[in-house]
Structures are given as structure tokens and as C-alpha cells.
């Protein structure tokens, strides 16, 4: 089971990036194969306040590949402590 280990928005984003990269790696892919990211966030204010740290961890973990992205503000996520969930779509060549 996946548990949220921190209430820090930027740290939750970094963990989400590590999770995405791990799944990509299991498929023989990397960040360059990402074509779309949809972020579900619970707080516009925390997102805005954390942009610099989130951007830095994205580049460090995923790389300097920037697919199409959308950010959706939601009332809540399944895990009560979660502040961000990232849905990723990748295209991996045969």
C-alpha cells in the first residue's frame, strides 16, 4: 500500500515524480517518453507557493523533458493526507 509520509506539498510532488519514473523504468522507458501529465491538487495556494521547489525536483527526478501538462484543483483525494496526485501518459516505442 502507498502511504503519504509527509504533509509538505513539494515533498509529495517529489515522491509522485519518483513513482512515475519507477513505473516508466519498469516499462523500459524514461521521462523523455512522457507525453502528458495531469496533476490533481487540493490547494492552489500550496501549489503556487511551492512552484520553485517542485520545478527543481521535477528537473532532478524526471529530467528536462516537459510534456503537455494540466493542473486540476480538486476537493480531496482518496488518501486523506495527499495533496497531489499525478496521472502520467507515456508513449514507449516497440
Where are these predicted regions, by residue range?
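Short, polar/acidic, helix-capping and beta-turn segments at strand->helix junctions
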Residues: 1-94
